[in-house]
Amino acid sequence: MKAGCSIVEKPEGGGGYQFPDWAYKTESSPGSRQIQLWHFILELLQKEEFRHVIAWQQGEYGEFVIKDPDEVARLWGRRKCKPQMNYDKLSRALRYYYNKRILHKTKGKRFTYKFNFNKLVMPNYPFINIRSSGVVPQSAPPVPTASSRFHFPPLDTHSPTNDVQPGRFSASSLTASGQESSNGTDRKTELSELEDGSAADWRRGVDPMSSRNAIGGGGIGHQKRKPDIMLPLFARPGMYPDAHSPFAVSPLPGRGGVLNVPISPALSLTPTIFSYSPSPGLSPFTSSSCFSFNPEEMKHYLHSQACSVFNYHLSPRTFPRYPGLMVPPLQCQMHPEESTQFSIKLQPPPVGRKNRERVESSEESAPVTTPTMASIPPRIKVEPASEKDPESLRQSAREKEEHTQEEGTVPSRTIEEEKGTIFARPAAPPIWPSVPISTPSEEPLEVTEDIEDRPGKEPSAPEKKEDALMPPKLRLKRRWNDDPEARELSKSGKFLWNGSGPQGLATAAADA
């Protein structure tokens, strides 16, 4: 042994965890693999003299609390020949074990950690004996109860007849509770006692859900026993009623040939009518008889899975793969007032200037394509506008306004029939049908169009198209500048005041 590197004495006999010889090789260099930290912690937990430093937490299986972190760090520094060791460095080493799933920190408790005895199967350490001899020390792990459970993935079971019920301890973990002797012959005799029914009695006494057992107590004797080289382990995570879970425990019995393996600890809220079973490729037994489900049970199971996914926002990828089964649709009843479909009719938006020009150009091209409208010659006026009296103009303008208000669109045939004294034939459809006429700025346009029609000059088709594409204000201005007779009439005040009121006069004055 090197000076300054005093180590904890190797336990003799069966007094605690007996680690392999390489863990105590004093000739190895300091800091090398003399012993791992979790080995050292287990060793301290087995010794009565360190109970004031580190001890098992009562009530939780595998949980321990470091009462004096500085002292534990000092002892670990002595073992590793590192006198500058402190708890910060030791806690970093413990955090390394989180990823290895050897132990984890207990949330909400300071300096409290919990061993994952599911993971601590040590096939590489064939000399480990996990039982103490004779008297159970005070620092031994508490005897597991029905309420204690782990949330780590369980070990792969190597026998189809193994205990498939979650939350129970296998017979190997029973014998590993520190209450039997340490030699192999005693273990074999105890095994025969267990097969006689002592474990079945224990299961009936502890398990509140023994009715869900699919194998029965007699099936324990046929289990393949784990070797002696492992720590106490759980068969798989607990399925006991959780106060935080929205799902009650299923009354359906578990299936003997299906592994109850959870996909992730984060999916603890999913209903476990049947616990998740791996695909046949991952299962140790690949025969198709493992997946002989009752159709009613499977329908109930898949429906509850669908409800879980939709209600708790879980991914549908958590569904097990069953190639021949279809997930039943989720029966979501809608309220009658929600189920009635309202027919919502949206009105088209008001036509803008660009859309108006597009509509006018399309409607202008439509009459040209028809043979009847294409053969109509341009308008011919019968009598000049100077012979008409203002009364007839007034009457025609009033009638035109009434028809416009009733129909909402520019009437073509009725207006032309009323103007039979002016035109010798019915007029073609107007080239500005979609312009709203009820606006004040558009009202004087009708009057000015009539004024434009009254002189002997008739604009040709290109001029009409140009007028249609022109903004209304510019169109009125051009007509005002080009038509002296209309200017005379508007200046005299007869037509604008009679036809469209003072609004037209104000618009004309503003344009002038």
Curated annotation (Swiss-Prot):
GO biological-process terms attached to the record: cell differentiation
InterPro entries membership: Ets_dom, ETS_fam, WH-like_DNA-bd_sf, WH_DNA-bd_sf
Compartments, record wording: Nucleus
Entry keywords, A to Z: Acetylation, DNA-binding, Isopeptide bond, Nucleus, Phosphoprotein, Repressor, Transcription, Transcription regulation, Ubl conjugation
GO molecular function per UniProt: DNA-binding transcription factor activity, RNA polymerase II-specific; sequence-specific DNA binding
UniProt keyword Cytoplasm present: no
Modified residues (N6-acetyllysine): K388
Bias-annotated ranges (Polar residues): 158-184
Cross-link Glycyl lysine isopeptide (Lys-Gly) (interchain with G-Cter in SUMO2): residue positions: K381, K388
DNA-binding region: 35-116
Skewed-composition ranges (Basic and acidic residues): 380-406, 453-468, 479-491
Family as reported in the entry's similarity comment: Belongs to the ETS family.
Protein name: ETS translocation variant 3
Species for this entry: Pan paniscus
Upper classification of the organism: Eukaryota, Metazoa, Chordata, Craniata, Vertebrata
Gene that encodes the chain: ETV3
